[in-house]
Protein backbone atom coordinates (compact mmCIF):
# COMPACT_ATOMS: atom_id res chain seq x y z
CA UNK A 1 0.00 0.00 0.00
CA UNK A 2 1.24 3.47 -0.79
CA UNK A 3 0.01 6.49 1.11
CA UNK A 4 0.46 9.28 -1.41
CA UNK A 5 -1.32 12.15 0.31
CA UNK A 6 -3.46 12.85 3.31
CA UNK A 7 -6.12 15.45 3.89
CA UNK A 8 -4.75 18.37 5.87
CA UNK A 9 -8.21 19.34 7.12
CA UNK A 10 -10.82 16.86 8.33
CA UNK A 11 -14.30 17.94 9.38
CA UNK A 12 -16.77 16.33 11.73
CA UNK A 13 -20.12 17.36 13.12
CA UNK A 14 -18.68 19.78 15.71
CA UNK A 15 -14.93 19.53 15.18
CA UNK A 16 -12.32 20.41 12.62
CA UNK A 17 -8.99 18.58 12.62
CA UNK A 18 -6.08 20.47 11.05
CA UNK A 19 -2.67 18.97 10.28
CA UNK A 20 -0.12 20.59 12.56
CA UNK A 21 2.69 22.70 11.11
CA UNK A 22 5.89 23.95 12.73
CA UNK A 23 5.39 27.68 13.17
CA UNK A 24 6.03 29.94 16.14
CA UNK A 25 2.44 31.13 16.48
CA UNK A 26 1.02 27.60 16.71
CA UNK A 27 3.91 26.42 18.92
CA UNK A 28 3.09 29.26 21.32
CA UNK A 29 -0.60 28.35 21.43
CA UNK A 30 0.29 24.67 21.85
CA UNK A 31 2.78 25.36 24.65
CA UNK A 32 0.34 27.61 26.51
CA UNK A 33 -2.37 24.95 26.32
CA UNK A 34 -0.01 22.21 27.52
CA UNK A 35 1.20 24.48 30.34
CA UNK A 36 -2.36 25.29 31.41
CA UNK A 37 -3.30 21.58 31.36
CA UNK A 38 -0.04 20.06 32.58
CA UNK A 39 -1.53 18.54 35.74
CA UNK A 40 -4.37 17.01 33.71
CA UNK A 41 -1.98 15.63 31.06
CA UNK A 42 0.89 14.27 33.12
CA UNK A 43 -1.13 11.52 34.75
CA UNK A 44 -1.47 9.63 31.45
CA UNK A 45 1.03 11.17 29.03
CA UNK A 46 4.76 11.12 29.67
CA UNK A 47 5.67 13.47 26.79
CA UNK A 48 4.28 16.56 28.54
CA UNK A 49 7.52 16.94 30.51
CA UNK A 50 9.40 17.41 27.21
CA UNK A 51 7.44 20.58 26.36
CA UNK A 52 8.90 23.12 28.79
CA UNK A 53 9.13 26.13 26.45
CA UNK A 54 7.72 27.45 23.19
CA UNK A 55 11.03 26.44 21.61
CA UNK A 56 10.47 22.85 22.80
CA UNK A 57 7.02 22.87 21.20
CA UNK A 58 8.44 24.24 17.95
CA UNK A 59 11.17 21.59 17.93
CA UNK A 60 8.50 18.94 18.56
CA UNK A 61 6.56 20.10 15.48
CA UNK A 62 9.67 20.15 13.28
CA UNK A 63 10.35 16.56 14.36
CA UNK A 64 6.73 15.59 13.63
CA UNK A 65 6.93 17.28 10.22
CA UNK A 66 9.93 15.11 9.33
CA UNK A 67 8.12 11.99 10.52
CA UNK A 68 5.08 13.02 8.48
CA UNK A 69 7.25 13.28 5.35
CA UNK A 70 8.44 9.73 6.08
CA UNK A 71 4.82 8.57 6.57
CA UNK A 72 5.54 7.57 10.19
CA UNK A 73 3.10 9.89 11.93
CA UNK A 74 0.40 12.39 11.04
CA UNK A 75 -0.71 14.83 13.70
CA UNK A 76 -3.81 17.01 13.79
CA UNK A 77 -4.88 19.83 16.05
CA UNK A 78 -8.44 19.47 17.36
CA UNK A 79 -10.50 22.65 16.90
CA UNK A 80 -13.93 23.46 18.28
CA UNK A 81 -15.50 26.64 16.91
CA UNK A 82 -12.08 27.69 15.62
CA UNK A 83 -10.35 27.25 19.00
CA UNK A 84 -7.46 24.79 19.42
CA UNK A 85 -8.40 22.42 22.26
CA UNK A 86 -6.18 19.37 21.83
CA UNK A 87 -4.34 17.03 19.53
CA UNK A 88 -4.86 13.68 17.84
CA UNK A 89 -2.31 11.72 15.86
CA UNK A 90 -1.84 8.53 13.93
CA UNK A 91 1.57 7.07 14.70
CA UNK A 92 3.39 3.76 14.38
CA UNK A 93 2.08 3.82 10.82
CA UNK A 94 2.83 0.69 8.83
CA UNK A 95 2.00 1.07 5.16
CA UNK A 96 3.01 -2.55 4.62
CA UNK A 97 0.49 -3.81 7.17
CA UNK A 98 -2.03 -1.00 6.60
CA UNK A 99 -2.20 -0.10 10.25
CA UNK A 100 -1.44 2.57 12.81
CA UNK A 101 -2.09 3.72 16.34
CA UNK A 102 -4.19 6.65 17.53
CA UNK A 103 -3.13 8.93 20.36
CA UNK A 104 -4.82 12.06 21.65
CA UNK A 105 -5.13 14.64 24.37
CA UNK A 106 -7.63 17.34 25.14
CA UNK A 107 -7.88 20.21 27.59
CA UNK A 108 -9.33 19.41 30.99
CA UNK A 109 -12.25 21.81 30.53
CA UNK A 110 -13.32 20.02 27.32
CA UNK A 111 -13.03 16.49 28.70
CA UNK A 112 -16.21 14.46 29.02
CA UNK A 113 -18.07 16.22 26.20
CA UNK A 114 -17.66 13.59 23.47
CA UNK A 115 -14.98 15.61 21.71
CA UNK A 116 -12.29 12.93 21.71
CA UNK A 117 -14.87 10.34 20.63
CA UNK A 118 -15.78 12.51 17.63
CA UNK A 119 -12.10 13.16 16.81
CA UNK A 120 -11.32 9.42 16.88
CA UNK A 121 -14.30 8.72 14.60
CA UNK A 122 -13.09 11.38 12.15
CA UNK A 123 -9.61 9.83 12.10
CA UNK A 124 -10.91 6.28 11.74
CA UNK A 125 -13.05 7.32 8.76
CA UNK A 126 -9.99 8.91 7.14
CA UNK A 127 -7.67 5.94 7.67
CA UNK A 128 -10.18 3.26 6.69
CA UNK A 129 -11.68 5.10 3.69
CA UNK A 130 -8.86 7.17 2.24
CA UNK A 131 -5.71 5.41 3.42
CA UNK A 132 -7.11 1.88 3.09
CA UNK A 133 -5.94 0.88 6.55
CA UNK A 134 -7.03 -2.55 7.75
CA UNK A 135 -6.46 -1.97 11.48
CA UNK A 136 -6.05 0.82 13.99
CA UNK A 137 -5.35 0.60 17.68
CA UNK A 138 -5.26 2.76 20.75
CA UNK A 139 -3.69 2.01 24.09
CA UNK A 140 -4.27 3.36 27.57
CA UNK A 141 -3.67 2.76 31.24
CA UNK A 142 -6.32 0.50 32.85
CA UNK A 143 -7.22 3.36 35.20
CA UNK A 144 -7.74 5.85 32.35
CA UNK A 145 -11.51 5.47 32.36
CA UNK A 146 -12.06 8.33 29.89
CA UNK A 147 -9.91 6.65 27.22
CA UNK A 148 -11.54 3.28 27.86
CA UNK A 149 -14.93 4.92 27.29
CA UNK A 150 -13.68 6.51 24.05
CA UNK A 151 -12.51 3.11 22.80
CA UNK A 152 -15.84 1.50 23.69
CA UNK A 153 -17.97 4.30 22.18
CA UNK A 154 -15.97 4.08 18.96
CA UNK A 155 -16.47 0.32 18.71
CA UNK A 156 -12.91 -0.77 19.45
CA UNK A 157 -12.36 -4.27 20.84
CA UNK A 158 -10.19 -4.94 23.87
CA UNK A 159 -7.39 -7.19 22.62
CA UNK A 160 -5.41 -7.57 25.77
CA UNK A 161 -3.17 -6.21 28.44
CA UNK A 162 0.57 -5.62 28.37
CA UNK A 163 1.74 -6.11 31.93
CA UNK A 164 4.04 -3.52 33.51
CA UNK A 165 5.28 -2.41 30.09
CA UNK A 166 6.11 1.24 30.83
CA UNK A 167 7.34 3.33 33.71
CA UNK A 168 5.04 6.16 34.74
CA UNK A 169 6.80 9.14 36.36
CA UNK A 170 3.42 10.29 37.68
CA UNK A 171 2.74 7.04 39.54
CA UNK A 172 6.47 6.34 40.06
CA UNK A 173 5.96 2.71 39.07
CA UNK A 174 5.66 0.38 36.11
CA UNK A 175 2.14 0.36 34.67
CA UNK A 176 0.02 -1.97 32.57
CA UNK A 177 -1.35 -0.97 29.17
CA UNK A 178 -4.70 -1.95 27.66
CA UNK A 179 -4.69 -2.55 23.90
CA UNK A 180 -7.83 -1.78 21.91
CA UNK A 181 -8.19 -2.26 18.15
CA UNK A 182 -10.68 -1.78 15.36
CA UNK A 183 -10.69 -3.45 11.98
CA UNK A 184 -11.96 -2.02 8.72
CA UNK A 185 -14.39 -4.89 8.22
Which residues does each predicted region cover?
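Conserved GNAT-fold acetyl-CoA-binding loop/helix
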Residues: 42-62
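Residue-level detector of secondary-structure transition/capping positions
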Residues: 35-38, 49, 65
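Short loop/turn motifs at secondary-structure junctions and domain boundaries
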Residues: 66-70
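Acyl-donor (CoA/ACP) binding surface of acyl/acetyltransferases
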Residues: 1-29, 33-40, 75-185
